[in-house]
Amino acid sequence: MNHQTWIQAAQWLSEQEIAIQPLLTLSAAPDEALQAALLQAPAGVLAASAAAVVGCGISDARSVFLSAAAPEEELRAAHGHCRYLAETPEEIRKLDALTGPFLQEGYLEDIAIRVWPNGGGAFTAENIPEFARLIRRMENLAVRALFVPFDQTGDLSRQAKDAFSLVKKIRSDMPCMLHAFCFEGLLEPLARGDTELLQTLRMLASLNDTSLYAAFFIS
């Protein structure tokens, strides 16, 4: 999704009065128009660089995520301004080693992980016990957010319901205290007028308000 399309979709979402925030993927610092759109209403950012993290203008680090695939110097430069997003065991170990020196005694680094509902990545709905054990072995990390990718060729409404159940299961099985979750790949089809998806997300947003109490993003 290009930036202009995202701005239009984000504006449309805000008009729906639904407790879901749009999330933008950024590789570099945004221009003034895009930054203004990010600050106009609650929104989140998934960044690929420290420049994008700092330049987006969002002050709440819980709404800004930086891919752990970024070079270590980028990860260090962005520390304290975002949450890191890991999707492999190697990235988990890298973050554990990298964040330790930044932390006061007794504190943990809050991170996000990407979990694939039907395979396609290292962390999946089928191997929750394995990646939960891995994360519990880390000295410095605590999972506080989840990213769930969607299959654009499938039934998005059904996937959304399943993804919400997956988020609840991971929170229970790890266990962890979730502050946020993001359903990836829904903003564009939603803004194109998928009414069934809109009704499903309204229902899930309502359930979130009474069960998970987490920030709900879509990208």
Positions of predicted regions on the chain:
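Distinct, well-ordered alpha-helical segments
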Residues: 33-38, 54-57, 75-76, 92-101, ...
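A charged N-terminal "starter" segment
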Residues: 1-83, 96-100, 107, 177
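Electropositive phosphate-/nucleotide-binding environments in soluble metabolic enzymes
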Residues: 3, 7, 47, 72, ...
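Non-cysteine beta-strand/loop elements that form the S-adenosyl-L-methionine
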Residues: 45-50, 66-70, 108-117, 141-148, ...
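Glycine-rich loops and low-complexity Gly/Arg-rich segments
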Residues: 49, 70-71, 88-91, 111, ...
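Active-site loop/helix belt of alpha/beta enzymes
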Residues: 10, 117-218
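Conserved anion-binding
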Residues: 80-81, 87-145
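Active-site-proximal loop/turn and secondary-structure-junction residues that shape catalytic pockets
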Residues: 26-32, 49-51, 69-71, 88-90, ...
